[in-house]
UniProtKB/Swiss-Prot annotation:
<feature type="disulfide bond">
    <location>
        <begin position="50"/>
        <end position="66"/>
    </location>
</feature>
<comment type="function">
    <text>Snake venom serine protease that may act in the hemostasis system of the prey.</text>
</comment>
<feature type="glycosylation site" description="N-linked (GlcNAc...) asparagine">
    <location>
        <position position="117"/>
    </location>
</feature>
<feature type="disulfide bond">
    <location>
        <begin position="142"/>
        <end position="209"/>
    </location>
</feature>
<keyword id="KW-0720">Serine protease</keyword>
<feature type="disulfide bond">
    <location>
        <begin position="31"/>
        <end position="163"/>
    </location>
</feature>
<comment type="subunit">
    <text>Monomer.</text>
</comment>
<keyword id="KW-0645">Protease</keyword>
<dbReference type="InterPro" id="IPR009003">
    <property type="entry name" value="Peptidase_S1_PA"/>
</dbReference>
<comment type="similarity">
    <text>Belongs to the peptidase S1 family. Snake venom subfamily.</text>
</comment>
<keyword id="KW-0800">Toxin</keyword>
<dbReference type="GO" id="GO:0005576">
    <property type="term" value="C:extracellular region"/>
</dbReference>
<dbReference type="InterPro" id="IPR018114">
    <property type="entry name" value="TRYPSIN_HIS"/>
</dbReference>
<feature type="glycosylation site" description="N-linked (GlcNAc...) asparagine">
    <location>
        <position position="103"/>
    </location>
</feature>
<dbReference type="GO" id="GO:0006508">
    <property type="term" value="P:proteolysis"/>
</dbReference>
<keyword id="KW-0378">Hydrolase</keyword>
<feature type="disulfide bond">
    <location>
        <begin position="98"/>
        <end position="255"/>
    </location>
</feature>
């Protein structure tokens, strides 16, 4: 019930405190209740909101810029007004960042690994999503999902998570249209004609390509889902060694350069 009250307040407030670079799903539809079992909600009472991905019973992967004070983590949520009987709440026990990941100039290190204070129980609405076994291919159809705004620039927020299909594009397109630096650890995805994409509130959520967890929502254009403004995603495959080392207890592991 605490989550329901907080999310309802967030929807009423229209996320007035939404963090810089947070993004939403535009042009999508309500996610099937069973297709977002790994999607988690990160929020606090001040109105900050992000998504994340459960990668095993104790760990969540999200964007570094989603870090917030007094973070609460909820799993198994589908409706802000109608709770599931298997929703679970957790607090962050530990947070791990890549070196300089809180520096906005480090585009390719916007990644945060969160250890939960208690293990999560798998259920009908909760299950982890494995790390990718191989990198994605340009042209792949990818699924985005989140609680972000569904209209832009005048933002409205849904009662349920929204999902949409987009395509993985050549990174060179994001360099041109988003004026991004020449980074190899960023994925570029979207619909060049516009109409579908991430928006405020979806930051930290997953990009799932051909069933594999390939990206973490980083950001997009100032107005969401515009033509020639594809979204930017952290390339999860490049960080699998760092993630696995941290989970194994090697907390001094360094990120790829």
């Amino acid at each position: 019930m605490v989550l329901i009250r907080v999310l309802a307040n967030l929807l009423i407030l229209q996320l007035s405190y939404a963090q810089k670079s947070s993004e939403l799903v535009i042009g999508g539809d309500e996610c099937n209740i069973n297709e977002h079992r790994s999607l988690v909600v990160l929020f606090n009472s001040s109105g900050a909101l992000c998504g994340g991905t459960l990668i095993n019973q104790e760990w969540v992967l999200t964007a570094a810029h989603c870090d917030m004070p007094n973070m609460q983590i909820y799993l198994g949520v589908h409706s802000a007004s109608v709770p599931n009987d298997d929703e679970q709440a957790r607090d962050p026990e530990e947070k791990y960042f890549c070196l300089s990941s809180n520096n906005d100039t480090e585009w390719d290190k916007d990644i945060m690994l969160i250890r939960l204070n208690r293990s999560v129980r798998n259920s009908k609405h909760i299950a982890p999503l494995s790390l990718p076994s191989s990198p994605p291919s340009v042209g792949s159809v990818c699924r985005i999902m989140g609680w972000g705004a569904i209209t832009s620039p005048n933002e409205t927020y849904p009662d349920v998570p929204y999902c949409a299909n987009i395509k993985l594009l050549r990174y060179s397109l994001c360099r041109v249209y988003q004026r991004m630096p020449a980074q190899s650890r960023i994925l570029c995805a979207g619909i060049l004609q516009g109409g579908k994409g991430i928006c405020k509130g979806d930051s930290g959520g997953p990009l799932i390509c051909n069933g594999q967890f390939q990206g973490i929502v980083h950001g997009g254009g100032k107005t969401c889902a515009q033509p020639y403004e594809p979204g930017l995603y952290i390339k999860v495959f490049d960080y699998t060694d760092w993630i696995q080392n941290i989970i194994a207890g090697n907390t001094t592991a360094t990120c790829p350069p």
